[in-house]
Amino acid sequence: MNYPYIPHTDEDIRAMLEFIGVSSIEDLFSSIPVSARSSLNIPESRDEFSVFKRLKEISEVNASLEDYAVFLGAGVYKRYVPTVVYDLAMKPDFLTAYTPYQAEVSQGTLQALFEYQTMVCELTGMEVANASMYDGATALAEAALMSFRLTGKEKVVVARSVHPEYRAVLRTYLEKRGFTVVEAGYDETGRVLLEEVDEETAAIAIQYPNFFGIIEDLDYVRSRSGNALLIVVVEPVSLALLEPPGSYGADIVVGEGQSLGLPMWFGGYSLGIFATKEKYVRQMPGRLIGQTVDQDGSVTYTMILQTREQHIRRARATSNICSNHAHAALIAAVYMSVMGPDGLREVARRSYSAAHYLQERLEDMGFKLCFSGEFFSEFVFNVPEDYPERWKWMMAKKILGPLPLKGFYPELGDTALACATEVISKEDIEKLLEAMK
């Protein structure tokens, strides 16, 4: 039977079978033992209308975050994304292009990635940024490897207040290669204590704001770093309000770019931010897009300094990162362009205000903050012992509550990490408070 979406006619199929010397399509599978064959148990075909109706019924079983009040942060955040972002980013011109190796036919994608790099530099206060990494965690691990290449040392001190899953990825990358990972503790403010730094330390890695939401004192961190390089893990939206790490002398800035227009799809897809000083550019992993002029004198863009193992000997490569998250970076570029500096600053301001209002209301109910340091849009507070069970109950009420922390930080006891972004309303907060009673 012929279908309009199948290119081969019955005559085409007969001609091909005759050419290869078999009488039917079934004969192509005759070598498969009968014992290995089974029915596919596929129902009879349906018309398009029936298929869409059935798929809609199945999809309605899923929970949509649009219906939930989300107080869950910890690295992935619910934010509002203007519709124009995906109208532009999902254009076939961008979606169908793979890696822009052939610069002469990829100028649109290359320019968008160049603009992404420029905006990341403006946000972080750094001199050069690459065209993206896989995610924030692997970007941190690559930063540590870069610090070893730059210093010739083999030890990194990472703050315990860095995202616990980032630290796990860091250890996975480093320890089997013989590198040393040492964790630095934190004080009652929630800020890092750097007592483990010595002359053998290649780099210090801290998060700003840290996993607890606390804004680290980068002046203190820089003063304690000695000759070690300073790696700062950032939440990019916060940098619209906070001083950029580059202004404190950070050597490498990495982070998760999901906040810049990407959805919360099961924790991804995500985007690794990576920026550094220009003098370190030849040790920077990943792809870098550069601007130049062509033979006619017109501005043009191309990939430069391709020191990946696809292009040079593995032993000399700075990274084995292959297909990076270029389209995610493009979405981030469109989002930052649409929002502009003022819009991004307003998103950060509203997130800060919502989180501090939530904190005040929780304290009014008797909940105590765990740390005294200033926070951005997340904070840790004490919760009842039965909170993990209550968290599940809140989900049934369409509330994604603050994250229980006991599994990540046993020393903190019964605590939770609360988050509020610009999409959280006072009504959402009251809904959470009612559930917390």
UniProtKB/Swiss-Prot annotation:
Keywords: Oxidoreductase
Reactions it catalyzes: N(6)-[(R)-lipoyl]-L-lysyl-[glycine-cleavage complex H protein] + glycine + H(+) = N(6)-[(R)-S(8)-aminomethyldihydrolipoyl]-L-lysyl-[glycine-cleavage complex H protein] + CO2
InterPro entries: GcvPA (IPR023010), GDC-P_N (IPR049315), GDC_P (IPR020581), PyrdxlP-dep_Trfase (IPR015424), PyrdxlP-dep_Trfase_major (IPR015421), PyrdxlP-dep_Trfase_small (IPR015422)
Domain of life assignment: Bacteria
Enzyme class: oxidoreductase
GO biological process, one term: glycine decarboxylation via glycine cleavage system
Xref: Pfam families: GDC-P
EC number: 1.4.4.2
Molecular-function GO terms, alphabetical: glycine dehydrogenase (decarboxylating) activity
CDD domains noted in UniProt: GDC-P
Family: Belongs to the GcvP family. N-terminal subunit subfamily.
Functional summary from the UniProt entry: The glycine cleavage system catalyzes the degradation of glycine. The P protein binds the alpha-amino group of glycine through its pyridoxal phosphate cofactor; CO(2) is released and the remaining methylamine moiety is then transferred to the lipoamide cofactor of the H protein.
Assembly and binders: The glycine cleavage system is composed of four proteins: P, T, L and H. In this organism, the P 'protein' is a heterodimer of two subunits.
Protein's name in the database: Probable glycine dehydrogenase (decarboxylating) subunit 1
Top-level taxonomy: Bacteria, Thermotogati, Thermotogota, Thermotogae, Thermotogales
